[in-house]
Amino acid sequence: MAKTDGQQSGGVDARLAGAVLTVDLAALQANYRLISNRLTGGATASAVVKADAYGIGIGPAAKALWAAGARDFFVAHADEGVTLRGHLTDARIHVLNGAHDGAEDAFLEHGLIPALNCLGDAARWRAFCAQAGKPLPCVLHVDTGMCRLGLDRREYARVVADPSLLD
C-alpha cells in the first residue's frame, strides 16, 4: 500500500520517494505453505532469499518463511549466508555460488552448505573435508539450460559415468 500526503513508511516520505512498497509477510507465508502443501513424494520447498530477499529484507522474509515451515534457504553468496545465519540459527543455508577458494573455513564456521557448480568445486570441497577430518554437507548444482551456474552436460555425463568424482 502506498503512503501519501507525507505519511512515513520505514522513515521514507512517500511524497519524495514516489512510491512505497509494503510487503505482506502473511501473504508470503501463505504462498510458501500453498506450494509446500502441493509437493509429493518426499519433495520439499525451499526459500530463495538472495539479494536481501529480492529487496524486501532478508531478516523479516526469512523469519516469516521459517515460521511457515521453510527449513532450507538459498542465498547467492557466502556473505548473505552469514547474514542469514544471524537471523536463523537452525536453518539449512545453501550458497548458490559455492565456496570460493579460501572461503571454505567460513562455510564450516557458519554452517553454510555450498552448491558445487563444477568438478573443480567438488575436488576443492573434497580436499577441504579431508583437511577438516569429516564429511561436510554440499549440494550438486546442475545447469538446467539457463547457462548460469552448475555442471554442464559434459561434466554431468562424467559424474554419471564415474560417481566417485563426488566422493
Q: Locations of the language-model features?
A:
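Active-site-proximal beta-alpha core segment in soluble small-molecule metabolic enzymes
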Residues: 13-15, 19-22, 27-29, 43-167
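Conserved PLP-enzyme active-site core in the AAT-like
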Residues: 38
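N-terminal amphipathic/basic leader segments beginning at the initiator methionine
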Residues: 2-17
